């Protein structure tokens, strides 16, 4: 009988990536097949996020529901991973004895051994250690599930912003070797992936080891990924302004594969609040980065994160944030009311902004951003946008859907063979959360590169010297 696995994922794109790797890993080692129905699963995994308020209580509420399933099926294995697992550790077991496995973001690769331990001994196991890059060395080969894919290039963060739990839950910055990243991207390209999104908590701090003992910077990695045939779009997330260096900006001048869209969190427009957050930059320095970016790529569109109601935020501080939003003219944003995270320096600050004031400021900020989003969308009316077709539309199975380079969802009439390919679409209608258009050019009418597998590249470029020894000649 086929064994079933169900994973519930909360949080960031890194968590989504980790969950996909868990499913692939347990599929390859134990033969588990994915199920959307928790009630029919043999293993239930909860991949958690601790960024938002009451994250722990949300976890224990879910575990309470899963406990009922375990009462019906005592052989059911329940595991908790992610950032809440890193924070809570053994405490999860004390509050929820139904949990068999507690693992951190850096120990998910040990899940097969943990499951074997539980199945063999019927005793629980907790492993929330930080074994650095070992995680990536033990994960299965990448498997494409469409024309877009996430590729993790680094883990952790060294910035220790006062509001953030990431350094405590995912550890400090560790970069994957550049060759490992490039080989994974090439494998995905060979499976039909056309767009990659490079992931990291602080992705522009990437410093990956090279095969010859050197160090590959993030700017160099971007150019190397862009050189892989079949990869026509590159995104990345998330960045920190203090490491958004000139060499990264220069990539926007000469690498068209890098999309004209950037998520660069600023959090606040007030220098006083930025100092309290330990962001290590000012609003003026942030604006200087944006000026350089727009000089390198005039059509670039920007998004940001904003924390509303940080301890000590005055009306004047908030107005400085609103001024920054207007001056930069952000396309989109992810904005949240501040909530204290246990164990962070900000948790010891006096949270003196009332909830009503926080909600009012959030409404004002989001309303302004929504106006700017609509303005950007209206400017696209009548323009031709290149779309990567991701599949059928959620609005109608008779239509296709895909994203522009600036991350707008576009619905249009097309044929099934377009899925996984690029098409040029004229925008004919602007809706609240999407666009509509008409196909004016198919991929066959474009001059795009054909992907090659890593094996075919090696075979094509392999030479033999006078002794018959194979050498690689790029």
From Swiss-Prot:
Q: Where is the Radical SAM core domain?
A: 143-375
Q: Kindly state which reaction or reactions the protein catalyses.
A: N(6)-dimethylallyladenosine(37) in tRNA + (sulfur carrier)-SH + AH2 + 2 S-adenosyl-L-methionine = 2-methylsulfanyl-N(6)-dimethylallyladenosine(37) in tRNA + (sulfur carrier)-H + 5'-deoxyadenosine + L-methionine + A + S-adenosyl-L-homocysteine + 2 H(+)
- EC number(s): the record gives 2.8.4.3
Q: GO molecular function, one example?
A: N6-isopentenyladenosine methylthiotransferase activity
- Protein residues bound to [4Fe-4S] cluster 2: 157, 161, 164
Q: What is its main location?
A: cytoplasm
Any Pfam family: TRAM
Q: Where is the TRAM domain?
A: 378-441
Per UniProt, the cofactor note for this protein states:
Binds 2 [4Fe-4S] clusters. One cluster is coordinated with 3 cysteines and an exchangeable S-adenosyl-L-methionine.
Q: Where does the record place the MTTase N-terminal domain?
A: 3-120
The protein's required cofactors: [4Fe-4S] cluster
Gene3D superfamilies, sorted: Methylthiotransferase, N-terminal domain, tm_1862 like domain
Per UniProt, the keywords (alphabetical) are: 4Fe-4S, Cytoplasm, Iron, Iron-sulfur, Metal-binding, S-adenosyl-L-methionine, Transferase, tRNA processing
What InterPro entries does the annotation carry? Elp3/MiaA/NifB-like_rSAM, Methylthiotransferase, Methylthiotransferase_CS, Methylthiotransferase_N, Methylthiotransferase_N_sf, MiaB_methiolase, rSAM, rSAM_horseshoe
Where is [4Fe-4S] cluster 1 annotated to bind?
12, 49, 83
Instruction: Choose one Gene Ontology CC annotation of this protein and give it.
Output: cytosol
Instruction: Decide whether keyword Iron is in the record.
Output: yes
| Compartmental location | Cytoplasm
Keyword field contains Thylakoid? no
Cross-referenced PROSITE patterns: MTTASE_N, MTTASE_RADICAL, RADICAL_SAM, TRAM
Q: Which HAMAP family match?
A: tRNA_metthiotr_MiaB
Q: Give the family, as the similarity comment puts it.
A: Belongs to the methylthiotransferase family. MiaB subfamily.
The subunit structure is: Monomer.
Q: What does this protein do?
A: Catalyzes the methylthiolation of N6-(dimethylallyl)adenosine (i(6)A), leading to the formation of 2-methylthio-N6-(dimethylallyl)adenosine (ms(2)i(6)A) at position 37 in tRNAs that read codons beginning with uridine.
**Protein name (Swiss-Prot/TrEMBL):** tRNA-2-methylthio-N(6)-dimethylallyladenosine synthase
Q: What organism is the protein native to?
A: Serratia proteamaculans (strain 568)
Question: What is the name of the gene encoding this protein?
Answer: miaB
């Amino acid at each position: 009988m086929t064994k079933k696995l169900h994973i519930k994922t909360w949080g960031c794109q890194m968590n989504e990536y980790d969950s996909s790797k868990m499913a692939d890993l347990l599929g390859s080692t134990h033969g588990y097949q994915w199920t959307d129905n928790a009630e029919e699963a043999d293993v239930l995994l909860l991949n958690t996020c601790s960024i938002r308020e009451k994250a722990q209580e949300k976890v224990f509420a879910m575990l309470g529901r899963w406990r009922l399933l375990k009462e019906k099926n005592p052989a059911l294995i329940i595991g908790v991973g992610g950032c809440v697992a890193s924070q809570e550790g053994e405490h999860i077991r004390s509050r929820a004895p139904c949990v068999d496995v507690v693992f951190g973001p850096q120990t998910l690769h040990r899940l097969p051994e943990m499951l074997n331990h539980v199945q063999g001994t019927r005793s629980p196991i907790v492993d929330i250690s930080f074994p650095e890059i070992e995680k990536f060395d033990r994960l299965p080969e990448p498997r494409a599930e469409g024309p877009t894919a996430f590729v993790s290039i680094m883990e952790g963060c060294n910035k220790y912003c006062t509001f953030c739990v990431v350094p405590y839950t995912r550890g400090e910055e560790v970069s994957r070797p550049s060759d490992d990243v490039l080989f994974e991207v090439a494998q995905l390209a060979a499976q039909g992936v056309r767009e990659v999104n490079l992931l990291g908590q602080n992705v522009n701090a990437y410093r990956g080891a090279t095969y010859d003992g050197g160090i590959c910077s993030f700017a160099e990695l971007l150019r190397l990924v862009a050189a892989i045939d079949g990869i026509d779009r590159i995104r990345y997330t998330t960045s920190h302004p203090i490491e958004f260096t000139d060499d990264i900006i220069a990539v926007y001048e000469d690498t068209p594969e890098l999309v004209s869209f950037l998520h660069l969190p600023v959090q606040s427009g007030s220098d006083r609040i930025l100092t309290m957050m330990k962001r290590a930059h000012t609003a003026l320095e942030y604006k200087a980065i944006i000026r350089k970016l727009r000089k390198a790529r005039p059509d670039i569109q920007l998004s940001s994160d904003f924390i509303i109601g940080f301890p000590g935020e005055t009306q004047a501080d908030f107005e400085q944030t609103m001024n920054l939003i207007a001056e930069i003219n952000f396309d989109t944003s992810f904005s949240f009311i501040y909530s204290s995270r246990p164990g962070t320096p900000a948790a010891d600050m006096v949270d003196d902004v009332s909830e009503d004031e926080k909600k009012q400021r959030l409404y004002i900020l989001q309303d302004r951003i929504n106006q700017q989003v609509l303005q950007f969308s209206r400017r696209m009316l009548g323009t031709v946008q290149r779309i990567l077709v991701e599949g059928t539309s959620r609005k109608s199975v008779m239509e296709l859907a895909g994203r522009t380079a600036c991350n707008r969802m576009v619905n249009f009439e097309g044929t099934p063979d377009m899925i996984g390919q690029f098409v040029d679409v004229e925008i004919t209608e602007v809706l609240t959360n999407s666009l509509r258009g008409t196909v004016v050019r198919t991929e066959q009418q474009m001059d795009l590169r054909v992907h090659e597998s890593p094996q075919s590249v090696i075979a094509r470029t392999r030479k033999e010297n006078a002794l018959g020894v194979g050498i690689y000649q790029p």
